[in-house]
């Protein structure tokens, strides 16, 4: 016959094993549920994949609304190939020039320049230069570029 203390130790060990076995069973049930519901657990990951680019776009738009260009010059000038007897509508070159606030230059003081050259029918504005000396929000320059691109496409479709 076993001593009482040894019997008590064996009983405690058996109870502990039984509790541990139940816990293992609970863990396996959890893993089974996790396997079934893995889509739900993956949703935050997919949302993060979607929201990071959206956040970057919103940050960029916020910068475009808040940053300003120190100057904004539009120059319209005649093409050298135009002759006085040519009755075709004037194809002028439009140059939009403004500072690019997002790119840094070598010395950090002179900003780089972006120029957009477009050929559009702008006869009424021939040989004019418009200079807007005050500071313009960058978003307006984006809108202006879209407008001129649309103008070029519409002119191209009219002449073809």
UniProtKB/Swiss-Prot annotation:
The membrane topology of this protein is: Multi-pass membrane protein
- Write out the transmembrane intervals: 39-59, 136-156
Say which domain of life the source belongs to: Eukaryota
Where would you find this protein in the cell? Membrane
Keyword list, A-Z? Membrane, Transmembrane, Transmembrane helix
* Chief site of localization: membrane
Instruction: Please give the GO cellular component terms listed in this UniProt entry.
Output: membrane
> In which family does this protein belong, per the annotation?
Belongs to the UPF0479 family.
What other facts are recorded?
A: Completely overlaps YHL050C.
Record protein name field: Putative UPF0479 protein YHL050W-A
Q: Which organism is it from?
A: Saccharomyces cerevisiae (strain ATCC 204508 / S288c) (Baker's yeast)
């Amino acid at each position: 016959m076993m001593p009482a203390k040894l019997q008590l130790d064996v009983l405690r060990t058996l109870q502990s094993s039984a509790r541990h076995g139940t816990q293992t069973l609970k863990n396996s049930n959890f893993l089974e549920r996790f396997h079934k519901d893995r889509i739900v657990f993956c949703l935050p990951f997919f949302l993060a994949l979607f929201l990071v680019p959206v956040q970057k776009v919103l940050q960029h738009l916020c910068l475009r609304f808040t940053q300003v260009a120190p100057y904004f010059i539009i120059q319209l000038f005649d093409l050298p190939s135009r002759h006085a007897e040519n009755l075709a509508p004037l194809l002028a070159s439009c140059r939009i020039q403004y500072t690019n606030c997002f790119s840094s230059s070598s010395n950090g003081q002179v900003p780089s320049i972006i120029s957009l050259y477009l050929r559009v029918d702008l006869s009424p504005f021939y040989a004019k230069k418009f200079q807007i000396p005050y500071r313009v929000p960058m978003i307006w320059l984006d809108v202006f570029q879209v407008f001129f691109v649309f103008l070029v496409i519409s002119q191209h479709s009219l002449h073809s």
